[in-house]
Amino acid sequence: MRFRYRKWRRPRRLFRSRRRRGYARRRWRRRAWGRRRRVRRYRRRRGGTKRQYISSIMQWNPQHRHLCYIKGITWLCAARADRMSWPGIKQIAATDSTRYWSTILVGGCGVLTLSMDWFFFENLRWRNRWSHSNVGYDLARYMGTHLYFPPLADIWYIVWTDTEFVDQPKKVMSYTHPWILLMTKKHKVIKPRKWNGKGKKIFLKPPAVFNSAWYTSDKWCGAGLGRIYFSFLNPFKQIMHTNQTEQSFPFAIELGNTDYDKPPNNSYDFKDTNEVKKVWNTAGKKYYYRADWDTGDGNAIMLPNTLSPTTPASWLLLEWDAPYWLWFWGKTYQDFVSSHTPEGNPYYGQIYVKWWPITNPYDQGPHTYPEDKEWCLMMLDPQPNFMTCNSIAAALKIAAFGPCVYAPQDTQTSQIPINIPMYYLSKWQWGGSTQGTSTHIDNPCNPRPKSIQIADPATAPRDVIHPWDVDASGTISTAKLKQLMEGLGYREPKPKPGPPETLIPPGAPTPELDYYSSETESDDFDTGDSEEEEEDHQDPRWVRESLDKLTRRLRGERRQRQQLGKGLLALLKEKK
């Protein structure tokens, strides 16, 4: 049945509608079948389980506290075209005999570890500012750091942060590879301004091991607060790079002994460049490498330790089931040469690897069995006076031609060098049992760049006087006095050689008594004269005189200590 919609409006009703009746009144009456049960107004406990009550965690806080914001700018790296796979930063931890050090290298990847040492080191280089001085505060609490990575003009880069780590930075350089960072959770890709890219913000929470607790500032030194993994990212040329016609490229030559279990046997005269060049140009002698075929299964490296490496003991064997483009990432020439330099051998920089005998650049495989890999010598086109570093150059080329890496020919001259800046804001809180330093007022007639006096966090607790360092009379303890003297550059002299320490014989003068006996006598500081003592020491009058002399002597020693403490405090104020 077909329905039709009305095209005309129904006429309005003219008659008056019926008046609406009112609501019926509700009549209440008592139930006839008994009284209602009393309502339970308390919460019933769940059977079998005890309810968990959430309460606030109370922790101790020092009496005097002050917030401090550390705001600054730094650089992650400064790279050029041929060093995109080299490390771009170097950090050396402080020891008992050396201070902390951090510097920027010419490279395109690296790991930056944030710490209290790094923040203070950056302040010494005029790269950050502290909103409040830490002078007078020996406790510190960390509350996190905000990071900002601005976009570059036309270069991509990738960043990843971590607060829970245990390995050393040199052992985690493989995590800075752009292909690995792309598969890491919570990574940040900073697109260039050419592609309408915007900067990325990251907040580094305090590590879980610290739990927002108070520690002395020297304990924060050397403790890693977070790590920043960074590298440049090439999203457009992942496999084939500029001027490449095939995915593969020659990187090694065939050896005489290709046994899988034995070390390679050098059957070529590498001192003769022309002979090696003939082998290089011979068909079937060059091996080709493809990054997309390298799974890492069965890969191995050998480095010579002696002048004539003919036995297994004369080689250093390294095995790691990782592709070579990841193995050689973050390496420099010194990483291959520094610890393997046979004295007197100009051709020590030889690297032997295991790879499939791929002699055709148009080979399409399959190559899936690691047992088919053979030893080969890494080498590029042989050139005179370049044989020492030829194998190392081949290894660095493999790293530079890896996935998502900027090869030397992928960048233009106008883009080099490339710098990656980083802005940060770190929040701290200083604390202590005594009030910290007051605001310093500079001379307005001789203006200087405004700054806040900052003490080295590693030595700040040493220069702070706590209530427990002073006794009831105001005298500084011996241990604290020694620390204050060390802050002024004083070092305790070495004791003179003498007889072993024994009990002082009766009647022998002590150095302390001799010092005070040389002072002039006064009314309230009497050291006593060498009078003849009475034979009868049981006389009460003699006992009272001896006690009176001893009391005056102790009073004088206390006064000398107080004067010495005031003098040291004055010297500390002048030094600050």
From Swiss-Prot:
Subcellular locations according to the entry: Virion
Biased composition (Acidic residues): 520-537
UniProt organism field: Torque teno canis virus (isolate Cf-TTV10)
Lineage, highest ranks first: Viruses, Viruses incertae sedis, Anelloviridae, Thetatorquevirus, Thetatorquevirus canid1
Purpose of the protein: Self-assembles to form an icosahedral capsid with a T=1 symmetry, about 30 nm in diameter, and consisting of 60 capsid proteins. The capsid encapsulates the genomic DNA. Capsid protein is involved in attachment and entry into the host cell.
Key words of the record: Capsid protein, T=1 icosahedral capsid protein, Virion
Bias type Pro residues, positions: 496-509
Protein's recorded name: Capsid protein
Bias (Basic and acidic residues) ranges: 538-551
Family stated for the protein in its record: Belongs to the anelloviridae capsid protein family.
A cellular component term, taken from the record's GO annotations: T=1 icosahedral viral capsid
Principal location class: virion
Low complexity bias spans: 562-576
